[in-house]
């Protein structure tokens, strides 16, 4: 089978969570980033006439120049620009919809390495753009790329965009208001900010609502975001909590842009997004906040979560991976709670428009305070099916159905496992990876089939 070369730029910029890539390389080279800003600015000026865009960023060393290039592109289309500086992704979403901005842009690659970066766009309502709108913007970006002179895109601009501290404080105040009146004085929490965007916000929230907070990984260098810390490595905080001999009630870890959170209980056991969905769903149902008695999870959520929710009279629906797609399903069904195993949780009863790691942490603490129980006690009946995830680096994202050996391995696994397991094989929307996820009652069969499928992918399109 001949495979398409990856040397030439592919005209497909947006993945499941905006545009991502290696900073400095297409599509995150200065020329293309400028064109992205110009295309978005032109679209907004046509729609709003006097358009203003809010830009926020994480702590990667490339985030400054990408923000500047975007700002120059926007301003070249006569679109106004404001900056929130280093701030979380959900912070930009909140401020965009509450402060009258025409759109919000986040410069971040979330959990990716520091060498990567990305661009996420929110509409004036604080929601991520639909796939259809992203496709329209792509066409405009390529038009501007062809029209622009490279010298214009690489012109001079400010050394950095000054961030507005008032904007960050407004967002922090909203977060605090979500748990107003709750007594958190008995909680002692370890917070891992991943040397990322949470470093600029978390200290404005947790201590001020009464949580005894110890912060770690809050000294970003531009190159240490997500490095052996945060939600990408929750075992680090979990180990610290477990060895603290009761000093901490739980650990909380954020990823680079703090749109998700993972936890560890007082014994140092890692608690993922599935468990958070379970405890939040039960609490919301008891208070009459769980509309339709429904939770929206994804294809990656464990079968054990579905069983535990069913025992509580709660229906679970599965959406495609990506909090954007979870939100779409929530809107369709009227659900007020949804999320991913990775820790993206959406609380529609808090009027949130995207996953928010800090809000999730506050809501979990609120459930603990309300119930008087520990995190471990609240999720004790969650019996997780054995699950394995294998990541395979690929040189091209060929549709699986066009890879006969891979399809044969998948079909063999599905036939062997039957109703006692699940097989999900998909490409990452943000990296050049194929992900193989298998759940099964039999760990031996699970690992056997995961290895067979991963090897078939590696042989067909692996790097």
Swiss-Prot record:
Protein name: Phosphoglucosamine mutase
Residue numbers of Phosphoserine PTMs: 110
Any one GO biological process: carbohydrate metabolic process
InterPro entries from the UniProt entry: A-D-PHexomutase_a/b/a-I, A-D-PHexomutase_a/b/a-I/II/III, A-D-PHexomutase_a/b/a-II, A-D-PHexomutase_a/b/a-III, A-D-PHexomutase_C, A-D-PHexomutase_C_sf, A-D-PHexomutase_CS, Alpha-D-phosphohexomutase_SF
GO function terms (MF aspect): magnesium ion binding; phosphoglucosamine mutase activity; phosphomannomutase activity
Species: Koribacter versatilis (strain Ellin345)
Pfam assignment, any one: PGM_PMM_I
Biological role stated in the UniProt entry: Catalyzes the conversion of glucosamine-6-phosphate to glucosamine-1-phosphate.
GO CC annotations on file: cytosol
Catalytic activity: alpha-D-glucosamine 1-phosphate = D-glucosamine 6-phosphate
Needed cofactors: Mg(2+)
Assigned protein family: Belongs to the phosphohexose mutase family.
The enzyme's E.C. designation: 5.4.2.10
Posttranslational mods: Activated by phosphorylation.
This protein's UniProt keywords: Isomerase, Magnesium, Metal-binding, Phosphoprotein
PANTHER family tied to this protein: PHOSPHOGLUCOMUTASE (ALPHA-D-GLUCOSE-1,6-BISPHOSPHATE-DEPENDENT) (PTHR42946:SF1), PHOSPHOHEXOSE MUTASE (PTHR42946)
Positions contributing to Mg(2+) binding: 110, 255, 257, 259
Cofactor binding comment, as recorded: Binds 1 Mg(2+) ion per subunit.
